């Protein structure tokens, strides 16, 4: 039984009173109560089970650790103190009322550790014995899967509950103890986490590699040749005088170019080989997230939200509410025998016998995989993406299509390629020409045509040993070695998975958290650490190297797996972790304060209020200068003063007439008066005359949330405003000004600014939906 102390409290004026524990009084003549997590899932399952069942939603967790206290009794075996979630009070009340009206209860929360824990909490709230057969699990919301689960309930898996509880308590201990320590070192509001801090560290260390990287120059040579039949092909220089061609500068390259240019070369060898390119396995959570980032430009958070929608089901005319994919939190590539029996005939009938392998493709599992669920796949082959156009939203359909294509391809025959390689000799220079021709497309029939075209490499005409070919062109090209790339969402998720940090279900919230905390920002889809991110990582590496590192975090994940498997106990894992953590925390409390005083960075800027030399501090938006005599003197200044004189603008303050200076805030640069402190936004004039008043200009502004928009310079006299950038063109249909929207991919879309114009994007979308 999980170690817990359950404290159920409610606020009544200023007093806290203990609630009376709920005692269930089942109604033998009532319905069967099934509790799931979401209303959408409840609706689908109730339709499947029929009138004898009442299906209700818990809306996620109903109990958790308290928000205002740590909620973990360290001295009592790390027992968590659970409280009812105040925003779920009505849900709890409705569930308890239904529990008394029904004859029995089945807990059908998600089939993972989190779902197991929710079921355990529900058993406590609804007076159900967790050791009775009350837990049902299914990996797809289809009639066969639901009915099979109903017939085979099990007791709640208390080992899995302990594993989830251990993760929750570990995260609470680290966050509750480490975050206040960071507040003292940097500024209030920061947070540290067992996994998020390691993810931030990876990003910071990659940035350090990039900054330290020294590019090295090298050159390559590519030559064009023509056969006797006037067929052209290209070849690359590979060797000079029998040694690898290493060209370090332009002089060496020019010499090689002169030795090849205009001269004939002899074909000394031609080799041909066939190879099979095997298909990839169906999606796991992490591979789905990676492909959604790379191919659909979705964030991992958005991907999981859309996948949840597809799993819980959508309303399909003639079929009711249908769950379209299997459970989306999985690390398994396994496919059920039942689905294999469906997909093989589908492939042979739809694409032909040649596309069906002799036996089903089976994929090996990674050593970290728990393999508790199937891979992510469609629940039925009756709903191809083409049948769901107009039913699913655009983004839902794009993700569903990605999952569908990957699954079908995973059970198709391999692609067959023929590779041809020809070696050319021109004096001391050896060149190589290669060509790849696809003989059979196999599983790549499921890929977009652009990608398939790219797999056919350079054309290579028929060549044989002894042929003489003539050079028609030769080029030397300069290159520089490149630093390692910054992490994207996709590459960071891949790295976290490879290193065993976190679990598939945690990746999206981790990436979301480190951005919200401003430890990292995104530039061109790549993660870039902020000054705050660097500072926090530096402190954690220095004082908490024992726990905030890749190996320790990965090992801890393995111990959580062992708890779930019954091979380790909650208490032992927590005790071993806390022993290391408490020692590092105690040491850090002493050493960090000592180092802070000794290594305080002092600037050359003098505080005009008390005469002290101002010190450098770190704030939410980066470095700033503060008076060391705080709290007696609370003077602060921008850090830019420490780097030189302030940049003065040519804009005068409206209040006092002083020339304003440039400052940087959370939404970028702005103007500030050094005399009276008045602020003013930096106005960027588009040069476009306001289409409403025809007097002012359209200028770039920011909303109170920081979003850029374009408004008339005569505001408030003229309230003309547009979200997209206006351009000096007018709509041919209605005469309104045109606007330009630039997407993250760099794509620009020009459209009419008038929402009532037939050509406006939203108007066209509404018209299409109406037609359907």
Regions found by a protein language model. Give the residues of each.
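Basic, low-complexity terminal or inter-domain segments flanking catalytic cores
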Residues: 2-33, 43-44, 51-53, 125, ...
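C-terminal accessory/connector segments of nucleic-acid motor ATPases
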Residues: 213-235, 265-306, 625, 629, ...
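Phosphate-backbone binding and catalysis cores of DNA-processing enzymes
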Residues: 26, 47, 94-268, 272, ...
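Conserved short loop/turn motifs at secondary-structure junctions
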Residues: 30, 110-112, 187-191, 272-281, ...
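Short acidic, hydrophobic short linear motifs in intrinsically disordered regions
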Residues: 267-270, 278-292, 319-328, 483-495
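Intrinsically disordered, low-complexity regulatory segments
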Residues: 1-168, 247-248, 254, 363, ...
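Short, hydrophobic-biased segments on the C-terminal half of alpha helices
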Residues: 304-308, 511-512
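A short, conserved structural fragment
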Residues: 311-326, 517-526
């Amino acid at each position: 039984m999980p170690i817990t102390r359950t404290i159920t409290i409610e606020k009544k004026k200023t007093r806290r009173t203990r609630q009376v524990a709920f005692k269930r009084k089942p109604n033998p003549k009532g319905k069967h109560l099934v509790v799931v997590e979401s209303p959408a899932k409840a609706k689908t399952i109730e339709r499947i089970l029929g009138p004898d069942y009442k299906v209700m939603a818990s809306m996620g967790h109903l109990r958790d650790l308290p928000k205002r206290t740590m909620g973990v009794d360290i001295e009592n075996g790390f027992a968590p103190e659970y409280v009812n979630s105040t925003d779920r009070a009505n849900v709890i009340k409705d569930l308890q009322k239904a529990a008394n009206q029904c004859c029995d209860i089945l807990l059908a929360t998600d089939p993972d550790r989190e779902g197991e824990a929710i079921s355990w909490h529900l058993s406590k709230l609804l007076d159900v014995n967790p050791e009775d057969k009350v837990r049902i699990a299914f990996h797809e919301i289809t009639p066969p899967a639901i009915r099979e689960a109903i017939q085979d309930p099990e007791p709640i898996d208390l080992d899995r509950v302990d594993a989830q509880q251990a993760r929750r308590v570990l995260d609470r201990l680290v966050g509750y103890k480490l975050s206040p320590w960071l507040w003292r070192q940097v500024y209030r509001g920061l947070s540290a986490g067992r996994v998020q801090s390691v993810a931030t560290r990876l990003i910071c260390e990659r940035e350090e590699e990039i900054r330290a990287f020294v590019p090295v120059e090298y050159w390559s040579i590519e030559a064009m040749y023509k056969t006797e039949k006037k067929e052209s092909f290209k070849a690359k220089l590979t060797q000079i005088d029998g040694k690898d061609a290493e060209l370090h500068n332009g002089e060496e390259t020019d010499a090689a170019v002169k030795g090849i240019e205009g001269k004939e070369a002899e074909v000394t060898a031609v080799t041909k080989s066939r190879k099979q390119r095997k298909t990839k396995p169906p999606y796991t959570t992490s591979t789905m997230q990676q492909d959604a980032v790379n191919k659909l430009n979705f964030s991992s958070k958005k991907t999981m939200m859309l996948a949840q929608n597809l799993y819980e089901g959508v309303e399909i005319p003639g079929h009711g509410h249908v769950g379209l994919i299997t459970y989306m939190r999985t690390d398994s590539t396994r496919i059920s025998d039942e689905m294999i029996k469906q997909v093989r005939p589908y492939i042979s009938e739809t694409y032909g016998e040649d596309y069906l392998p002799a036996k089903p493709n089976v994929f090996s599992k990674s050593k970290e995989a728990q393999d508790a669920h199937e891979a992510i796949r469609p629940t039925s082959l009756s709903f191809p993406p083409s049948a769901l156009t107009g039913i699913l939203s655009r983004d839902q359909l794009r993700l569903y299509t990605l999952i569908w294509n990957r699954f079908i391809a995973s059970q198709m025959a391999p692609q067959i390629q023929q590779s041809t390689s020809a070696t050319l000799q021109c004096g001391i220079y050896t060149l190589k020409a290669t060509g790849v021709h696809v003989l059979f497309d196999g599983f790549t029939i499921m890929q977009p045509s652009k990608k398939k075209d790219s797999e056919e490499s350079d054309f290579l005409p028929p060549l044989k040993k002894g042929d003489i070919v003539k050079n028609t062109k030769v080029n030397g090209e300069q290159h520089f070695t490149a630093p390692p790339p910054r992490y994207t969402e996709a590459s960071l998720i891949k790295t976290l998975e490879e290193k065993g940090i976190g679990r598939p279900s945690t990746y999206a919230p981790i990436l979301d958290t480190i951005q919200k905390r401003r430890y990292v920002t995104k530039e061109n889809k790549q993660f870039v650490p902020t000054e705050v991110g660097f500072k926090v990582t530096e402190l954690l590496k220095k004082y908490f190297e024992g726990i905030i590192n890749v190996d320790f975090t990965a090992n801890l994940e393995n111990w959580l797996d062992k708890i779930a498997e019954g091979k380790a106990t909650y208490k032992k894992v927590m005790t071993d972790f806390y022993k290391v953590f408490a020692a590092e925390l105690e040491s850090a409390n002493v050493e960090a304060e000592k180092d802070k005083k000794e290594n305080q960075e002092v600037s050359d800027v003098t505080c005009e209020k008390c005469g002290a030399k101002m010190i450098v501090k770190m704030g939410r938006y980066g470095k700033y200068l503060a008076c060391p005599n705080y709290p007696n003197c609370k003077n602060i200044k921008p850090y830019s003063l420490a780097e030189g004189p302030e940049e003065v603008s040519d804009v005068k303050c409206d209040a006092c007439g002083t020339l304003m200076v440039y400052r940087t805030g959370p939404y970028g640069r702005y103007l500030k008066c050094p005399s009276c402190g008045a602020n003013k936004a930096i106005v960027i004039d588009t040069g476009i005359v306001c289409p409403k008043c025809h007097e002012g200009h359209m200028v770039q502004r920011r909303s109170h949330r920081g979003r850029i928009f374009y408004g008339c310079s005569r505001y408030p006299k003229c309230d003309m405003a547009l979200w997209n950038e206006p351009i000096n063109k007018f709509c041919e249909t209605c005469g309104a000004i045109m606007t330009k929207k630039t997407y993250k991919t760099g794509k620009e879309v020009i459209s009419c600014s008038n929402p009532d114009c037939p050509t406006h994007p939203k108007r066209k979308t509404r018209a299409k939906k109406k037609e359907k």
